[in-house]
């Protein structure tokens, strides 16, 4: 079915979100060979490819990495994540999470965040992104304009950020700058 989409609509990219690393590589090689234009391959890999693929050793969750005080170590971890993604044929990681975990009632961010302060989230996420870039992987910080101080699961509904423009600019948007 995917091969038909590639041929019929000349799609430019794919996102993978489940399976195993061997099958993933086989599919990607097949799809790339079939496409006349190289496909941009993406994955939602906030804590490495183990977030989506089975039988892969996971990296620590962002909440754990939020406690690491060594930016060079975080950058090295980000690079290892990126190298793992690159080996599988991934070019683009929908990560890191730039949400500031400031709402205990938030049902979805929690351990996906690097912390509860804008400074910590900015610092930790930047090092992880730089590591990915060192490995040649594109990144996309999420969830713009901030999902850390909401009480809804964005996989089930559309959360809203009901703060003043000043607050959103000072807090929620800070890691995106």
What are these regions (language model features)?
Residues 2-124, 143, 148-164:
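Enzymes and membrane/adaptor proteins characterized by extended Gly/Ser/Thr/Asp/Glu-rich
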Residues 132-141, 167, 171-177:
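Phosphate/pyrophosphate-binding betaalpha-module
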